[in-house]
Amino acid sequence: MISVIVPVYNVEEYLEECLESIKQQTFTDIEVILVNDGSTDGSREICERFCQKDSRFKLINQENQGQSVARNRGVKESVGKFIMFVDSDDVINKNLLEVLLPYMKTEVDIVECRMTRKKEEFYLNKPSKIVFKGNAKEAILNCIEIKEVKFCPVTKLYRREIVEKVPFLEGYIYEDVFTGINYLKHMRKIVVVDYIGYYYRVRPNSTMTKSFTEKDLDIFKVGNQLIDSFKDDEDMLPYIGYFMFYIGHGHYLKDGINKMNIYADLYEDFIRKAAFIAKQSKEVVRKYRLLRLYLFAPKYYTTITYPIYKRLQNRWISTKKLINNLNDKLHIRKIWLFKYEG
């Protein structure tokens, strides 16, 4: 059995579409654990309606305690051999579980599909194929280099034991940074398939789109706990240091931080600490250009070095696109001339 866990909070506008996509799964041996996290809109009533019509749906009501608490509660109440998390404003392909389950072979603990923010892409039915397969270290390196493996908790089918080893950090946002990497740390193997099975809806008030608040500073608490969880792994710790350096700088940019901001020192201290951990490995320094740029001039990285690097990078990308377009046009012209002369 597969347990599908859905934390629910004030999503009445999207919830029915989400639950219907789970209900319509072609793999039917499922239970759907809905954890209503103190919704004040019509979400609870929608959940109750699905539970009345389909015995596979089970509703748990709790006071508002946050998404992590809701997910942990869902895991505790579930009984499936495998677990999948679905956010209540998203949609999954009706074939998703049927596609992922066959890849859950011996020693494979996680199977991941692709997600999209474009609905037209979501509805394309393409055959699945493996695009990555690896052990814990290989998967973590792939993830921190922003390749096939993602650290988000959704889009994945998990073997139950992995999820039980790593509860979600409660009381934080960005908790998936810690949980996602630690899932990879504790697993044996992961398989990633080139199958778009998950539609991720970006809402105006989501964590990724809202304006900066003090709650965004949770990324440092989560990041420090992630670093601490690898303190006994001398081989991987510098890579985690680089990952948090990258994440920390990404949040510096996303949150609109500058030298005049009251939190600037907090961001820069975290970036500095993460870079120090990363530079303990010559291999990590050699491998990651952004880290080398930072170590070259730490004081000027956010204000001078990185902005110049990005401008040059964007200019190179634009030039490369222009060259590719010209090559395409020349190729088409050659074909046309060949046909004409023939």
Where are these regions (language model features)?
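Donor-binding/catalytic cores of nucleotide-activated saccharide
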Residues: Q67-S68, S88-V191, R201, N205-E214
